[in-house]
């Protein structure tokens, strides 16, 4: 599921922190499966997760200002 910045801006700080932690966990699972010699569930999934994490962090920084 692709996260849009508009939807992220409507979330509270607590929701953003929860989303960030869940995204980091899913990235960790993908990386560990690749490290154990398995193939990722889809080739672009890790890239997508990294970009979603960046979006969440960007919105969190915007809210600090």
UniProtKB/Swiss-Prot annotation:
Q: Does the keyword Repressor apply?
A: no
Q: Please name the GO terms of the biological process aspect recorded for this protein, alphabetically.
A: translation
Stored Pfam families: Ribosomal_L29 (PF00831)
User: Which keywords annotate this record?
Assistant: Ribonucleoprotein, Ribosomal protein
Ranges for region Disordered: 30-49
Q: Name one GO molecular function term.
A: structural constituent of ribosome
Give the family this protein belongs to, as stated in its UniProt record: Belongs to the universal ribosomal protein uL29 family.
Can you quote a single GO CC term?
Answer: cytosolic large ribosomal subunit
Q: Its domain of life?
A: Archaea
Bilayer-crossing regions:
none
HAMAP family found in the cross-reference section:
Ribosomal_uL29
The keyword Cell inner membrane appears for this protein: no
Q: Give me the gene this protein comes from.
A: rpl29
This protein is called Large ribosomal subunit protein uL29
